[in-house]
Amino acid sequence: MGRIGISCLFPASWHFSISPVGCPRILNTNLRQIVVISILAAAVSLLYFSVVIIRSKYGWLSKDKKFQRYLARVTDVEATDTNNPSVNYGIVVDCGSSGSRIFVYCWPRHNGNPHDLLDIRQMRDKNRKPVVMKIKPGISEFATSPEKVSDYISPLLSFAAEHVPRAKHKETPLYILCTAGMRVLPESQQKAILEDLLTDIPVHYDFLFSDSHAEVISGKQEGVYAWIGINFVLGRFEHIEEDDEAVVEVNIPGSESSEAIVRKRTAGVLDMGGVSTQIAYEVPQTVSFASSQQEEVAKNLLAEFNLGCDVHQTEHVYRVYVATFLGFGGNAARQRYEDRLFASTVQKNRLLGKQTGLTPDAPLLDPCLPLDIKDEIQQNGQTLYLQGTGDFDLCRETLQPFMNKTNETQTSLNGVYQPPIHFQNSEFYGFSEFYYCTEDVLRMGGDYNAARFTQAAKDYCATKWSILRERFDRGLYASHADLHRLKYQCFKSAWMFEVFHKGFSFPVTYKNLKTALQVYDKEVQWTLGAILYRTRFLPLRDIRQEVFRAGHAHWRGVSFVYNHYLFSGCFLVVLLSILLYLLRLRRIHRRAPRTGSLWMEEGLPSQKGPGPL
């Protein structure tokens, strides 16, 4: 076997020889194999550096979104860092009928993604308590003395000014939004109250407060804000794909000719207070109307709005139905029921010559009160004596006429228009009386089951009042349940059931109602939805800054990628040069005589083979 001699520029006395026997295997490969090995080496190098780049640039995107939301809820109960200059603040005053409450909210700098909303949370003080304050009476009490309104609301604003860092006052928006109490006032009195606020507040406080920041909002607006707040806390406005999240097809309002989009299913809201009942839910599909009159009514009940900061983007466009029914709250319904009971009994007694309910010994039997309980109704100086029979089914039957249902299609309470609900693909949260009726006494709040609720309500109604009192004294009911709750639990259970199933037409098999007092351990107010909607354009500034930073980051990223590719290219060139050099040596070796040898030794001429014998 021949030898290959390689000469290097080492000291003159250093010479060596290499035999193919001891060389790497690659010297015995053909050209095709060498090319394949080279390509594979280059591909492996490029793949390696691509993985490094992707992991370093996008590794955070692979984190579990559920864990992030859980972490956000945990940090949401921490005290707000008022020393952080990137934290922004906003203030909402809810001027209700019985009093006014101020809520201070805060949020970090927007992340620059135009698809995301502001991460607004309730501000918490050093003791981790929400920054909230309430005063009485309601602002409507100053209808005849509007000049005193600024003094009335001043304690609330001073309270907020103490918690919001002074350096942030001039950029902190203040919204004063008035609800039910102010709605019933004449427009002239409303205007006088608002003008006093707009005139005096800027003199004493540096908050961002313009003419549009003080107004009387409608029941429809209040319902929309409540719907926004609930769904924001539930994370339904985060348009990220998750396997276990329910989705719905949506025809974007104003783009009915376009193809439907698929996004997270939002939750509907049911709220039964003492005076009124309200329902709000998204209407994802384009609706049709039975008549032009119905269409005209629907315009006042459907709200179309864009929560996003870009009016040209449609992913945060929603069509929401909101209807409020005065007189359908739990206490107002009982009052209506008693009024009719009193009037009908007096009329029957007059016609039949009876004395039913006029004495304690001959009480009127009321199926909507617990068994054997005694109660009284007083009107116009007269007293009607009642005794409960605890008949839940009869109570429900008695209450059905109070729904004021009509035979017209797509209607609910009082014959009011109601768009179709996709019961198989929907979810509702029931608040206030929906929760109290299921939890305070029956202890079955949460996931609603009509059959279980009905049976529990029947058992409660049919239980003697003396036993119910004994259970109450032993503390077997919720801590905030009182004797008033125990007395009217039977009535309110039947009323809630009828409103939900007969009034709003939910089937008794419906499984997606959750009765709740809080969402993720937080009491969600409509004021959260109000500030989310009214500050929706604020992210534009941060988005522009993020785009500017992203441009520079892009060039840094390009430079980073370019350097890695340059290194890979240099590595490939060096590898190919070595291989080509070895190939050239091999070809030189093949052209040499097979029996010849190349010797390189110090100070000796090359040896020649012996001549022929």
Swiss-Prot record:
Show the stretches that span the lipid bilayer.
34-54, 560-580
Q: Name one Pfam family in it.
A: GDA1_CD39
Q: Which reaction does it catalyse?
A: a ribonucleoside 5'-triphosphate + H2O = a ribonucleoside 5'-diphosphate + phosphate + H(+); a ribonucleoside 5'-diphosphate + H2O = a ribonucleoside 5'-phosphate + phosphate + H(+); UDP + H2O = UMP + phosphate + H(+); UTP + H2O = UDP + phosphate + H(+)
Give the Cytoplasmic membrane side ranges: 1-33, 581-613
Provide the alphabetized UniProt keywords. Answer: Calcium, Cytoplasmic vesicle, Disulfide bond, Glycoprotein, Golgi apparatus, Hydrolase, Lysosome, Magnesium, Membrane, Transmembrane, Transmembrane helix
Q: Report the InterPro entries cross-referenced here.
A: GDA1_CD39_NTPase (IPR000407)
Span of the signal peptide: none
Q: What is its EC number?
A: 3.6.1.15, 3.6.1.6, 3.6.1.42
Active-site residues are: 222
Instruction: Output one GO BP term.
Output: CTP metabolic process
Q: Does the keyword Transport apply?
A: no
A single Gene Ontology CC term: lysosomal membrane
How would you summarize where this protein is expressed among tissues? Ubiquitous.
Q: Does the keyword Hydrolase apply?
A: yes
Q: Which cofactor does it need?
A: Ca(2+); Mg(2+)
- Quote one Gene Ontology molecular function term: ribonucleoside triphosphate phosphatase activity
Which family does this protein fall into? Belongs to the GDA1/CD39 NTPase family.
| Name of the protein this chain belongs to | Ectonucleoside triphosphate diphosphohydrolase 4
**Which species is listed as the source?**
Mus musculus
